[in-house]
Design a protein with these regions (language model features):
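Active-site loop segments of alpha/beta catalytic cores
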Residues: 1-195
Length: 195
């Protein structure tokens, strides 16, 4: 038996849930110190929650949710992501790992290929929600063994009125044929049907 804890929203989504996504992105440019203060506060909150979860629930794995982009691009440059979010996630995921959590699964159903080095640095074991726009075979070739990729089936291809088992089987076979057997787990990206 394995205990898996899900946690949402993540740091970026918490920022734009407290405000609004467009204003949050503007604030990263116009109010960087205030945004860093907010993110530090959110990290402290996440660490307090992690302490309670690890003390009482003792999860084996964490499924953490924070969308970092659209289908075609991240919401911010890799440099900006590093400046604002990398250290916080290293603290959060580091805490979980040092307190018995064996597996960190991070959900971001988006394009985020440019952030994979940071995912590895912050301790993510599996990126769940990886969309086909990320060139998954290239990511596996470059980063396989350091991180695994779970996705490769864009939800819009299988989650719509009129879907069929044949359509799903075809997409699963396509994903497995394109991405191989190592460091890849076929899975729908999870987003809405239009994503």
């Amino acid at each position: 038996q394995m205990c898996i804890r899900d946690r949402a929203p993540g740091l970026f989504e918490q920022c734009h849930h407290l405000g609004e996504i467009q204003q949050t992105l503007i604030n990263l440019y116009d109010e960087p110190e205030h945004m860093k203060d907010l993110i530090r506060y959110l990290v402290d909150y996440e660490l307090e929650l992690a302490e309670q979860l690890c003390t009482h629930l003792k999860p084996d794995a964490l499924f953490h949710h924070d969308d970092w982009g659209s289908q075609v691009s991240t919401f911010m440059s890799p440099d900006m992501f590093e400046e604002f979010f990398l250290d916080g996630y290293k603290q959060i995921y580091g805490y979980y790992k040092s307190h018995g959590v064996e597996l960190i699964v991070h959900h971001s159903d988006s394009y985020a290929a440019t952030l994979v080095p940071y995912m590895i640095d912050m301790g993510i074991d599996i990126w769940q929600g990886v969309m086909t726009s990320n060139n998954i075979p290239e990511l596996i070739k470059k980063y396989g063994g350091k991180i695994s990729f779970m996705g490769g089936i864009d939800s819009a291809k299988v989650d719509y009125e009129g879907w069929s088992r044949d359509v799903i089987a075809k997409e699963v076979h396509r994903a497995c044929d394109e991405n191989g057997k190592l460091y890849f787990i076929p899975c729908a990206s999870i987003g809405l049907a239009m994503s």
